[in-house]
Amino acid sequence: MARVTVEDCVDKVENRFELVLLAGHRARQISQGVPITVDRDNDKNPVVALREIADETLSPDDLKEDLIHSLQKHVEVDEPEAAPAQIANAAEEIAEGIAEAGEEDVVTFDRMSEEELLAGIEGLVAPEKNDGF
């Protein structure tokens, strides 16, 4: 029965490798409890999945999309992008905020030569040795 079913499915899904992926995915769905769309006739889940594809009770495109979705680790949600005018306005506001920043907002760092750094390191006291650690 499975041989005839595979031959029937090749008309619906032309690539045999893709057919194996789709039927395997559908068989896993059936084993997880998703209702079947054809009579079981005492067949195992992979054969039922092939029969569903052959009888076109399931769309191969929908099954393929579901397979891809199940394999994705990160599903992107398409969000509407901001209009270019909104982006330009936001950039101008940020630039104005930076220009208006006062002197007290600017962070300065002390400069130190290599010799001063080495002298500072030599002046450090080693921590006491602890028996517990």
Swiss-Prot record:
Q: What class of enzyme is it?
A: transferase
GO molecular-function terms, A-Z:
DNA binding; DNA-directed RNA polymerase activity
Sorted UniProt keywords: DNA-directed RNA polymerase, Nucleotidyltransferase, Transcription, Transferase
Report any Pfam family annotated for this entry. Answer: RNA_pol_Rpb6
Q: Cite the EC number.
A: 2.7.7.6
Which reaction does this chain catalyze? Answer: RNA(n) + a ribonucleoside 5'-triphosphate = RNA(n+1) + diphosphate
Q: Which BP terms does GO give this entry?
A: DNA-templated transcription
Respond yes or no to whether keyword Ligase is given for this record: no
**Is the Oxidoreductase keyword given for this protein?**
no
Q: State the GO CC annotations.
A: DNA-directed RNA polymerase complex
Q: Which family does it belong to?
A: Belongs to the RNA polymerase subunit omega family.
List, alphabetically, the PANTHER family matched: DNA-DIRECTED RNA POLYMERASE SUBUNIT OMEGA
Tell me, what does this protein do in biology? Answer: Promotes RNA polymerase assembly. Latches the N- and C-terminal regions of the beta' subunit thereby facilitating its interaction with the beta and alpha subunits.
Whom does it interact with, and what assembly results?
A: The RNAP catalytic core consists of 2 alpha, 1 beta, 1 beta' and 1 omega subunit. When a sigma factor is associated with the core the holoenzyme is formed, which can initiate transcription.
This protein's name = DNA-directed RNA polymerase subunit omega
